[in-house]
Amino acid sequence: MIKDIAFTAYPSDNVKSTREWYEKMLGLKFSGAFEENGVEMYNEANVGPSCFALMTSQWVQRKPGTGVGVAFEVDDIEKTAKSLRDAGVSVEDIYTTPVCKVTSFDDPEGNKVTLHQSTR
């Protein structure tokens, strides 16, 4: 079911300024913003075979500084989400971007787990 870790994400109240800090301080090269209404909501930098992402705190529903999230790469997000729902897990609606599909759910401890399916 799980193939790989797709990305690690930090929540950010201001993705643009946080991205600029990571670019300046750590030399990360981000691939391009995903924006809504002119606001940078998500951006990622390739790091080895995976990537590091900055994501608006409203998407991940966590405040900055509250920990790292994990996103597991799957072959078929619809099938995986259905399987989880059938097992009684409350899975969020699948969100589609120009490059991927994403959904999330909480583990038994309340940690947010994300499923990711690349569409590129």
Residue ranges of predicted features:
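Short hydrophobic/aromatic beta-strand or adjacent loop that forms the aromatic wall/cage
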Residues: E40-Y42, G69, C100-V102
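Vicinal oxygen chelate
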Residues: M1, S31, A81-R120
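Short secondary-structure boundary/capping segments
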Residues: N43-E44, W59-R62, I94
